Each structure stands twice: as structure tokens, then as C-alpha cells.
Amino acid sequence: MPIEIRRFGVGHRRPDGPPGTVGIEGRVLESRAAGSITELAFGRSAHMAPHSNPRWTCFLVIEGGGWTGVGDERTRVLAGEAVIWPPDVLHAAWTEGTPMRAIVVELAEDPRLLAASRAGDGAAAGAAPRPVSKGEGRLADRPHRRRAGDDGQGEPD
């Protein structure tokens, strides 16, 4: 199967969100019965109108920060944080003075149960984790292979 590339980001978004949403653009990257993946870009003072959907939703903030609400709770959320919105519960997200980017993953199944089943222990959500021994190892050495004329290309040293 060939590699499939899906572009997102600036130039690939369109206005997105439920009715009443202001200042948000997005790009659906994948959508099927099992779930969907969407990139959202919130401008300054943007807001996603409170809404619910029948799927579990993981709201993964990848840049900037803003606010999220689930039911009656409200909290600040920053890049590197993920919020789990349960199905059929009102949820929203918004920004004030700064923009925010997020990846939204909607799943037909509870992601906490998926993680437990992938770990092989079949533990229910909220169960105590199994103790594991400390891993040993290190990253493999990567030889430095800079070619003449490559000074301005790629990642910094």
C-alpha cells in the first residue's frame, strides 16, 4: 500500500465547528465509523459553541493555549495537554488573547478502555496499573553525516 500524505495547517483549513462557533478553522484528516481526526486552529478570542456528540473526544492542544469546559467544569489548557470529553456531555473550547491549535480525535470507544486493552491486561478504566520493572537501554548511536553544502538544510545540530 503506498504512503498517503494528508496536508493540514495554513492554506488547508476552512471555517469549522458547530453552529455558533466563531474564529475557528479546521481540516478533517480522517473520518470513518470508528472515529475521526481533525486539526483545529483557534484565532484570538475564538470560541467553539457548547455542544455534545455521541463519541469520546480527545482534544490534544499542540500549540498555544486557551480554555475548555466539560459539563459545569471550566479549566485552562496549554500546549502539551490533552482533554477527554465524554460522549453526550456538553463541551466547549475557547481562547482569549492568544491563538491555539489542537488535534481532535473522536473515538467510538472509551479511549481509557482502548489503552488498557492494548496494554494486554484488559483492566477496566480506573483500575490500578500493574507494576512493571524498570526498563534498561539507550538510544542507538547516530553517526553525524553532514555533506558539503548542507549547512542551511534540515534540522540544527
What annotation goes with each model-predicted range?
Residues 55-66, 71:
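Glycine- and acidic-residue-biased ligand/ion/polar-headgroup-sensing regions
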Residues 36-53:
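Conserved short histidine dyad/triad with adjacent acidic residue
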Residues 48-50, 68-69, 85, 91-97:
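Short beta-strand His + acidic residue motifs that chelate non-heme Fe in jelly-roll/DSBH
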Residues 72-87:
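Short acidic-glycine-tyrosine-enriched beta hairpin
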